[in-house]
Amino acid sequence: MSPRSCLRSLRLLVFAVFSAAASNWLYLAKLSSVGSISEEETCEKLKGLIQRQVQMCKRNLEVMDSVRRGAQLAIEECQYQFRNRRWNCSTLDSLPVFGKVVTQGTREAAFVYAISSAGVAFAVTRACSSGELEKCGCDRTVHGVSPQGFQWSGCSDNIAYGVAFSQSFVDVRERSKGASSSRALMNLHNNEAGRKAILTHMRVECKCHGVSGSCEVKTCWRAVPPFRQVGHALKEKFDGATEVEPRRVGSSRALVPRNAQFKPHTDEDLVYLEPSPDFCEQDIRSGVLGTRGRTCNKTSKAIDGCELLCCGRGFHTAQVELAERCGCRFHWCCFVKCRQCQRLVEMHTCR
């Protein structure tokens, strides 16, 4: 092997280790709770944190259970959004939780980083508004009368605090000495895109006040969107993600579209560095489970269809008996009574 090839292999290995470490904090999702943390020494025992995250944990003990919930939200949403794809966000009981999938510069890794940073920002913001955290509360910068004539009141979600904490905790590995590497630039961009998915979908919720339900006075507050909406938005960004490459721009390195004919990506778009594998065959070492045994849709021409999901291997068809409620009747007052019925359905699974 030539010296240049050796150097390239070493760089790829460093990037892989670097990227795996950056996402290891997602292992917190495997814990039932970290709310019982009451001593700084406990932070040292939390699996998956790098040293600077351990230091943040010690300074922010009360916030760590929100970080855990954010990690759980991210994994659950990833599995929902990718439920019909060849790679369906399957997790492992080891580090990193998504296997080596997140160590590659693919669009799947881009989504994982985006939804993870969004999960932390979302969970910490909601914890602020619900009064769980002493360090933050409602957003008091929103007040007075709006141009639309309603009164800002109630508890507006403190998204600024949630985003700031996510930036400090999630981005800490990339902002270290390797922050100029291609993967660090990619991860930082996608982390920020995840948080922007919340910011751009913030909504206004209102309550009317008046006699007999009239709306003589309307008070409103800003609220984060449902996390499912954030997931949908980021899944759309995944579908339209931009393949990029590092390039020297002035005195710094930046990511630019690999295809010069494509328009530049925005801060809200997802970016990736390399094509994805096909995820067809099981590769336990990489954390890829393959698609054998997966349920597929015989009539669909999309990615959930048997032809694509099964990677051309064909599929098995079996008659499966499903139990379901039927003949439901409302009884006064007040309950619904149903019978249990059996129904035969065809189930298709990949060979």
UniProtKB/Swiss-Prot annotation:
One Pfam family recorded for the sequence: wnt
A biological process term (GO) from this entry: positive regulation of MAPK cascade
InterPro entries documented for this protein: Wnt (IPR005817), Wnt4 (IPR009142), Wnt_C (IPR043158), Wnt_CS (IPR018161)
Record PTM text: Palmitoleoylation is required for efficient binding to frizzled receptors. Depalmitoleoylation leads to Wnt signaling pathway inhibition.
Annotated lipid attachment (O-palmitoleoyl serine): S212
Entry annotated with the keyword Lipoprotein: yes
GO terms for cellular component: cell surface; cytoplasm; endoplasmic reticulum lumen; extracellular matrix; extracellular region; extracellular space
Family as reported in the entry's similarity comment: Belongs to the Wnt family.
Quaternary structure and partners: Interacts with PORCN. Interacts with PKD1.
Protein name: Protein Wnt-4
Organism: Mus musculus (Mouse)
